[in-house]
Structure formats: C-alpha cells, structure tokens
C-alpha cells in the first residue's frame, strides 16, 4: 500500500491536481458567491413552501405527494449544502481541514444524489399510476416509505464513501482536478449514474406517453372527441418535454465535465466552467419545485392560501399594535374579528 497523506493541507492536494487555490477574493469569486447565495435562498424558500403546502393540505396526503415532499426535502437539503459551500469557498477553502473539506463535498453529493434519485422514483410512480388509471396512486404507504428510505440510503452511501475510502489521499496520481481530494473514478461513476437515471426517466416517460396516446386514441374512435384527444396529447407532450428538458439543461453540462475529469482528460479545461455548471445543477432544485409542484392547480391554491395567511397574520399584528397605541389617546375601540377586517366599535 502506498504512502497516505492524511496530515497534509488542502493546499497540498490542490497543488498536486493543478487547481488554483485563491488567497484573496477575485471578481469571479464574488460573482459566483453572489449568484450562489441568491439561488440558495430561493431554493430554501421555494421548497419550504412546497413542504408546508403538502403538510397542511390533506388532499396531498397521497403517495405521489409524499414523493414530491421528499423531492422538496432533498432540494431543501441541497440549498443548505450549497449555502454551506458559499460560506466556505474562495480564499476560505485553504483554511478548511481535510474533514471540513469532505463535509462540504459530502453535503453536496448526498443532497444532489437524493434529488436525482427521487426524480426517478417519481417517474416510476407516475407510470404505475397511469397504468392503473388512477388520479391519485394507491400505492401502499409502507412501500412509499421504503422507496424514500432507499433513496436516502443510496444518497448517504455515495455522499459518505469519499470521506472513508473513495478518495485519493493514498494515491495522488488518481486525484481529480475539479475535486482534488476525490478519486477520478468516483467522479466518473457519479456522472454515469446520473446519466443512467436520465435514460431511465426517458424510457419511463416515453412509455407513459405512448400508453396514454393509444388509450385516448381508442376513446376518440368511439366518441367524437378528436379536439379533446389532440389537446390531451399536446398537454402530455408538453409535460414530458418540460420534465426531461429541465433535467437536461440543468444536469447535462455538469455531468459532461465530471465525466471528462473522471476519465482524465488533460486537454479539457474543466476548471474554467466547473463553478458555473455546479450552480446550474443547484438551480435544478429551484426548477423542480416549478415543474413538479407549481403546475398542480391545487398546489397553487394552497400556496396562495399559505402566503395570504402569512400576510394576514402580519396585517393583524400591525393592526393590533396600532390599536394598543391608539387606546392611550382616545376611548375609541377597534375590534379585529376572525376574518381580519377591522371594525369600529361605537363605544365612546
């Protein structure tokens, strides 16, 4: 077994891989952090809203919505992980210990893996629901729980492996350029796994599309509903294109550079674009909320109700504060009924 460099600094591994470790804040670092913080905050707020909507509306207490809730939780975790990265990047990277660096990387790997795996689970559940001709899946809750547990076990496995064994601390010639403490084989496996998930999603949604098209077409042959058939088909095409298109746009660039680095491409300038492609992958956690949740009419109504309730509570508190202030100077009393609209009481 070769010599292991457990006592070396982060700078040692970055120099070994040829990745620059900045000692001061460059304009590029400031831009990346500013964009990253903005995306992270939006991801946190959006997915918190999705989780609150699913928890508060009993109509969403169905297996498919449990999976959507798990997707929101994974994306919320991704927002936290990326926020942690933004506070430990740039010149601060050099001050990290090896354990701190692996924690930073592990949070990202775990959260993004959970998000991607949940996307596949949702696709499989949608296929099962469509084949069973159900609006809401009746998949036993125990199976949904097992599916969610399986997603997180796989995510934690991929996230924790680098810190324990799948690193290059004992084999410097295997270190990657984008993640100087990780083995190139880890990056290649992660990229290929994400690509496999995408191909499986394409296969599942393609099967759903052709199944629904055949079914609606048979119905159209017996009933004069050709315009409705066309509308249903176009709507399904739109849904499939949005789902797969969002995944391709957000994930493909990052998968390509990870795979190139994992395969040891020396002539590929992966370091020039890695931060921006990682930001694009993180933006998928924001896009997921729009694609999988906000397109649901009932979900949108629940969002409006939650936001209106929050605004109403704030308005009520402000009115109550105004009332208590006014009582000191006049005997006029203001009552606030449950509907939140102030009424004047004539007691003088």
From Swiss-Prot:
<feature type="transmembrane region" description="Helical; Name=2">
    <location>
        <begin position="67"/>
        <end position="87"/>
    </location>
</feature>
<feature type="transmembrane region" description="Helical; Name=6">
    <location>
        <begin position="240"/>
        <end position="260"/>
    </location>
</feature>
<keyword id="KW-0812">Transmembrane</keyword>
<comment type="subunit">
    <text>Interacts with SLC9A3R2/NHERF2, MAGI3 and PLCB3. Interacts with RALA and GRK2.</text>
</comment>
<feature type="lipid moiety-binding region" description="S-palmitoyl cysteine">
    <location>
        <position position="308"/>
    </location>
</feature>
<keyword id="KW-0564">Palmitate</keyword>
<dbReference type="Pfam" id="PF00001">
    <property type="entry name" value="7tm_1"/>
</dbReference>
<feature type="topological domain" description="Cytoplasmic">
    <location>
        <begin position="125"/>
        <end position="143"/>
    </location>
</feature>
<comment type="similarity">
    <text>Belongs to the G-protein coupled receptor 1 family.</text>
</comment>
<feature type="topological domain" description="Extracellular">
    <location>
        <begin position="261"/>
        <end position="276"/>
    </location>
</feature>
<keyword id="KW-0325">Glycoprotein</keyword>
<keyword id="KW-1003">Cell membrane</keyword>
<feature type="topological domain" description="Cytoplasmic">
    <location>
        <begin position="52"/>
        <end position="66"/>
    </location>
</feature>
<dbReference type="InterPro" id="IPR017452">
    <property type="entry name" value="GPCR_Rhodpsn_7TM"/>
</dbReference>
<feature type="topological domain" description="Extracellular">
    <location>
        <begin position="1"/>
        <end position="30"/>
    </location>
</feature>
<dbReference type="GO" id="GO:0009986">
    <property type="term" value="C:cell surface"/>
</dbReference>
<keyword id="KW-0449">Lipoprotein</keyword>
<dbReference type="InterPro" id="IPR004066">
    <property type="entry name" value="LPA_rcpt_EDG4"/>
</dbReference>
<feature type="short sequence motif" description="PDZ-binding">
    <location>
        <begin position="345"/>
        <end position="348"/>
    </location>
</feature>
<dbReference type="InterPro" id="IPR004065">
    <property type="entry name" value="LPA_rcpt"/>
</dbReference>
<comment type="function">
    <text>Receptor for lysophosphatidic acid (LPA), a mediator of diverse cellular activities. Seems to be coupled to the G(i)/G(o), G(12)/G(13), and G(q) families of heteromeric G proteins. Plays a key role in phospholipase C-beta (PLC-beta) signaling pathway. Stimulates phospholipase C (PLC) activity in a manner that is independent of RALA activation.</text>
</comment>
<keyword id="KW-0297">G-protein coupled receptor</keyword>
<dbReference type="GO" id="GO:0005886">
    <property type="term" value="C:plasma membrane"/>
</dbReference>
<feature type="glycosylation site" description="N-linked (GlcNAc...) asparagine">
    <location>
        <position position="15"/>
    </location>
</feature>
<feature type="transmembrane region" description="Helical; Name=3">
    <location>
        <begin position="105"/>
        <end position="124"/>
    </location>
</feature>
<keyword id="KW-0807">Transducer</keyword>
<feature type="topological domain" description="Cytoplasmic">
    <location>
        <begin position="207"/>
        <end position="239"/>
    </location>
</feature>
<keyword id="KW-1133">Transmembrane helix</keyword>
<keyword id="KW-0472">Membrane</keyword>
<feature type="transmembrane region" description="Helical; Name=7">
    <location>
        <begin position="277"/>
        <end position="294"/>
    </location>
</feature>
<keyword id="KW-0675">Receptor</keyword>
<feature type="transmembrane region" description="Helical; Name=1">
    <location>
        <begin position="31"/>
        <end position="51"/>
    </location>
</feature>
<feature type="transmembrane region" description="Helical; Name=4">
    <location>
        <begin position="144"/>
        <end position="164"/>
    </location>
</feature>
<feature type="transmembrane region" description="Helical; Name=5">
    <location>
        <begin position="186"/>
        <end position="206"/>
    </location>
</feature>
<feature type="glycosylation site" description="N-linked (GlcNAc...) asparagine">
    <location>
        <position position="7"/>
    </location>
</feature>
<feature type="topological domain" description="Extracellular">
    <location>
        <begin position="88"/>
        <end position="104"/>
    </location>
</feature>
<dbReference type="GO" id="GO:0070915">
    <property type="term" value="F:lysophosphatidic acid receptor activity"/>
</dbReference>
<feature type="topological domain" description="Cytoplasmic">
    <location>
        <begin position="295"/>
        <end position="348"/>
    </location>
</feature>
<feature type="topological domain" description="Extracellular">
    <location>
        <begin position="165"/>
        <end position="185"/>
    </location>
</feature>
<dbReference type="InterPro" id="IPR000276">
    <property type="entry name" value="GPCR_Rhodpsn"/>
</dbReference>
<protein>
    <recommendedName>
        <fullName>Lysophosphatidic acid receptor 2</fullName>
    </recommendedName>
</protein>
